[in-house]
A protein has these predicted regions:
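Active-site gating/metal-coordination segments in enzymes
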Residues: 1-85, 131, 135
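Residues that cap or flank secondary-structure elements
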Residues: 57-58, 87-88, 140, 204
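Internal, well-ordered alpha-helical segments in soluble enzyme and binding-protein domains
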Residues: 62-66, 92-95, 106
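H/E-rich (His + Asp/Glu) clusters that bind or coordinate divalent metals
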Residues: 113-245
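Active-site acidic short loop of glycosyltransferases
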Residues: 72, 104-105, 157, 232
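Distinct, well-ordered alpha-helical segments
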Residues: 1-6, 26-34, 54-56, 86-103, ...
Length: 245
């Protein structure tokens, strides 16, 4: 967090989220908010109190006390859902409904199309939360056009944002899906026989952009909606937060 805050201190156009874990003190968090231009929190499942990073629930890796702070200041909480079924998991659905209702000032971002690299989870689960007013989604590193199209169709473009995932997006490879599974493939982790074709891999970010383009083509959206998807939706969401008020 100190590094992120230092990088955004002098450039007012740069905004940041701070990393949160369940053990962080309330007074420490509020002190950071009052002194810095912080737009929200980023909890992560690897900090789960249960030590189970696969099947943990939302409140295992961020506490309600911390969510209360986000609600008080109207902050963003950007989150990677856990559990194998992601947004199709009943625990995740029920928790999002509960938290969205109890903390209406929190602006939730469900990263990676609600961590649904494959379309089936969105097709199964998104209809149960699509009417929640304070949930947004980003498309970062999702490389399947069917998944992105399912999100476009499921929640409407006004709640969706492009995300670059700067650490992963610059790597060469692709997130692939089969059945209910998904994984990142790169030149070092497969033994596919590819002598019959050009086996060079492009950047994951390019694969994501290609999937977004195909999803847009399928949805027949306007030029103005494209601008919203790639810029305006995110800017409007970020501009709606002032943690120091």
């Amino acid at each position: 967090n100190e590094y992120i805050l230092e990088q955004t201190k002098t450039l007012t156009e740069n905004k940041c989220l701070i990393l949160i874990n369940p053990n962080m003190d309330k007074n420490y968090i509020e002190g950071l908010l009052l002194k810095n231009n912080i737009k929200g929190f980023k909890p992560y499942r690897f900090y789960s109190k249960t030590k189970d990073t696969i099947n943990c629930k939302i409140l295992d890796f961020i506490t309600e006390e911390q969510i209360e702070i986000a609600d008080k200041f109207g902050l963003i909480i950007m989150m990677h859902l856990a559990k194998k079924d992601a947004i199709a998991d009943d625990d995740n659905i029920n928790d999002l409904i509960y938290l969205s209702d109890k903390y209406p000032n929190v602006k939730w971002i469900l990263a990676h199309c609600a961590r649904s690299y494959s379309a089936w989870a969105l097709e199964k689960g998104i209809k149960k939360i699509r009417d929640l007013k304070n949930i947004w989604y980003d498309c970062s590193t999702v490389c399947e056009s069917d998944s992105i199209d399912a999100l476009y169709q499921g929640v409407g473009l006004e709640k969706i944002m492009y995300g670059s995932d700067d650490m992963i997006g610059r790597m060469r490879g692709k997130y692939i899906t089969f059945g209910k599974a998904w994984s990142a493939i790169n030149s070092d982790n497969h033994n596919l026989a590819l002598s019959h074709c050009d086996d060079r891999m492009t950047f994951i970010r390019y694969e994501q952009l290609r999937a977004m383009k195909r999803g847009i083509r399928n949805s027949k959206i306007t030029e103005s909606e494209k601008q919203d998807l790639f810029y305006n939706n995110a800017k409007n969401l970020i501009d709606s937060v002032d943690s120091r008020n």
